[in-house]
Amino acid sequence: MTDIERDVRKVAERARDAAADLAPLSRDAKDEALTAVADALRERTEEIVAANAKDVAQARENGISEAMIDRLTLTPARITAIADAVHEIVELPDPVGEVVRGKTLPNGLELRQIRVPLGVIGIIYEGRPNVTVDAAALCLKSGNAVLLRGSSSAYSSNTVLTDVIRQALASTRVPVDAVQMVPGKSRESVKHLMRARGLVDVLIPRGGASLIQTVVNESTIPVIETGTGNCHVYVDEAADLDQALKIVLNSKTQRCSVCNASETLLVHAGIADAFLPRALAELREAGVTIHGDERVRSYDSSVVPATEEDWATEYLSLDLAVRVVDSLDEAVAHIRAYSSAHTEAIITDSQAAARRFVSLVDSAAVMVNASTRFTDGGEFGFGAEIGISTQKLHARGPMGLPELTTTKYVVTGEGHVR
């Protein structure tokens, strides 16, 4: 056993012990701890900003893009927003102990199915240090211990944020080891985390497709896939074109670097002449680079010829792949071929078309006459989320507090025997 493997197993063992102590704690105890964390973030803002500045300076030296540097950067205002988000989690209902269903059996036994924590959750994520706090707060509220493995590009930031959280927990009833960083910057530590079966109950990767696929392919621990969003908007032949244009622009440009932004626009041939010239002009004015098929390029010669790779790409930028289709079924076939199963939208005034699209498209969220940008725990009214699950087990769609639990059955009898 290497030193790195030994270190990873040590933190996982401590997390397992902490999870056992955390699981039975009351909501008051957990909320008290989260309030202490939020207060500590505000009190130690200067220290957090200083640590983050080291990461940002190193990122610039390494030639990281400005978009990635923006994700990495923590300002006093952003730290305040992170602390506010922790307070919002305090206000959310505690899912632990919730009775999912219950009944009295014919033999008189009382049966209840109740929510319980998953146990130890490993979070593997890229260069967004706010995830350190968000993930820790959500896991604590749902009664889980958490092991955090962020990007090496945010190592200084994640280290100080984890220290802030742990020092805040030290004065509360929540065990300090309920929140730990996986030691080291090397990929070897990630490898050993992914193989800590029996100590870690589930891994949740947050980041790009490459990170997620690496974890899915190499982990011996159950994985919940989150985030990759090759989202589609289909403008049907029965669409209100003014409404469609508004939704297309919002889905792509309101915030292009997030997983629920649209990446491909599919337009029915029956309305292409009326819709595409307007849509292409307004998208271009908004700074969007269009990658289109031959029919799209016939409306605008400046459109970049689309390749097979474009249809499968999650750009996370002001780029959009555009294709003309001859039918709703052709749009669905395209989505089935290239979608990441995150969010797809249909714009139509035809109830029959909407019903068919909803029934045929197999994604975590399907929008009818609404922007893909609404796939979000907060927008759905669920509160904060750990990510958007694009798989079917154990959760699908926005993963809030209930999705960070499992269930167990409690059966109460009066001396019953079988």
Curated annotation (Swiss-Prot):
Pathway: Amino-acid biosynthesis; L-proline biosynthesis; L-glutamate 5-semialdehyde from L-glutamate: step 2/2. It comes from the Bacteria. One of its GO terms (molecular function) is glutamate-5-semialdehyde dehydrogenase activity. The keyword Cytoplasm applies. InterPro entries: Ald_DH/histidinol_DH, Ald_DH_C, Ald_DH_N, Aldehyde_DH_dom, G-glutamylP_reductase_CS, Glu-5-SA_DH, GPR_dom. The keyword ATP-binding does not apply. Its EC number is 1.2.1.41. One of its GO terms (biological process) is L-proline biosynthetic process. Its main location: cytoplasm. One of its GO terms (cellular component) is cytoplasm. It is found in: Cytoplasm. Keywords: Amino-acid biosynthesis, Cytoplasm, NADP, Oxidoreductase, Proline biosynthesis. It catalyses: L-glutamate 5-semialdehyde + phosphate + NADP(+) = L-glutamyl 5-phosphate + NADPH + H(+). Catalyzes the NADPH-dependent reduction of L-glutamate 5-phosphate into L-glutamate 5-semialdehyde and phosphate. The product spontaneously undergoes cyclization to form 1-pyrroline-5-carboxylate. Belongs to the gamma-glutamyl phosphate reductase family. This is Gamma-glutamyl phosphate reductase.
